[in-house]
Amino acid sequence: MGKYLTSPPNLTGMPPGVPYIIGNEAAERFSYYGMKSVLTVFMAHYILNQSGVLAPMNENESYMYTHLFVFGVYFLPVLGAILADGFIGKYWTILSLSIVYCLGNLTLACMATSWGIAIGQRMMLLIGLIMICLGAGGIKPCVSANVGDQFGESNKHLLSKMFGWFYFSINAGSFISSILCPWFLANPKWGPGWAFGIPGIAMLIATLFFWGGRNKMVHVPPAGLGYLKQTFSKEGILTLARIAMVFFFILFFWGLWGMSNGAEWTLQAEKMNLHWMGLNLIAAQVQTANPILILIFIPIVNYILYPAIDKVFTLTPLRKIGIGLFITAFSFVVIVMIQGWIDAGQKPSINWQLLAYTILTLGEAMVSITGLEFAYTQSPNSMKSSVMALWLLTVASGEGFVALVNKWILGGGQKVSAYQYFTFFTWLMVGAAVVFTIVACFYNYRTHLQSQLTADEVATEPILHGGTPS
């Protein structure tokens, strides 16, 4: 690792490694969201048995497996963080697990082959999703922490903008793939093989692009076994607990957000009038409203909304998140209204769900982007990936919670209408937002950035006290 930079250079502009990391993230997110955009629909409408006969899952079963998959993707960052911070560093963790990720996508693409059907599409689906969980989950905390590692004191003023562009790249990739992959799935000429194969090609490109920037990036060395000792020390646990107290309430946001991304909202859209501006949309394409809107909202909230609110009261990161949680709850009020009309035998316009996406995406812009920056800046230097994993664990917990609710409905034979289902989650979000607002009032900020030191100086720096507290 001696040939690589191990601490941020003294720059006032954007670090040279950032474009490679952001480009990699755009392609990887294209892969992930493209695959996920068709996953629930594939299970509910396209999956075959070993005889090649259509054998779809029911709606709640497909919901449950989708949420369990996302739970795995966002739970496994814990292992990726330990591997990166403690043993092989962020770069090698990302590169090695990206290969596993590619193999998982290849497995899903092969489900449509004759031998894939003979083995069993459910078995192939399980193997592929487990590999994607390992790959996508393992690299998740490392990528966002790695991009933050490129910055030091001299260019820390660009960190907030960088996380905005980082999130922009996520949604640019998501937007394109969420249009393409449902189209491939719905077109008999292409079908599931291409719908899952295109994301696999994108992941291969992401891996090669990241490898191509290896000499431009800062490679912060792992802390070794001392990382585990310090992380699980009393002080390390208190650090994680202090941040986790804030993160706990955000899991409810991610649980609700996950419903809009190829799951419950998509199946609701199938029961709506999908004619929009002269186009006949596919239900799975409606979710592309989210990445389109996030690309619009990122500059609006950063350059218009936040400065305007700041004139009324100081807009701290946790206040941004709190406002975003209340906005998210309001988006589900619209979903409840839509479901009421559907249950009454009507076929409401998809414009109503697009309104819900607009409100939800505004909430996301305030919660998710702010949360990424908060997770990075509030974590000690040797624990960047670990705290990012804790942030991602809120996504896993949210998805896991929703999966458990669906499991309870399935296993208990409960007769819960979709209207009652969405109403429950609406009130849950309101309650979480209220309690979060109270808890956030007691949080004390402490910011840490990577020191612009030599490799030897970094090696002698105390593990839990790196960076510049502010």
Residue ranges of predicted features:
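Central cavity-lining transmembrane alpha-helices of secondary-active solute carriers
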Residues: 64-85, 172-175, 288-303, 397-400
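Short amphipathic helix-loop junctions that connect adjacent transmembrane helices
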Residues: 37-61, 149, 262-283
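Intracellular loop-helix junctions on the cytosolic face of multi-pass helical membrane proteins
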Residues: 1-23, 151-160, 164, 169, ...
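Hydrophobic core of transmembrane alpha-helices in multi-pass small-molecule transporters
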Residues: 26, 102-104, 118-139, 338, ...
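A gly/Pro-rich, aromatic-decorated transmembrane alpha-helix motif that marks the paired
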Residues: 37, 75-82, 109-110, 171-187, ...
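Intracellular juxtamembrane helix-capping segments at the cytosolic ends
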Residues: 136-154, 364-379
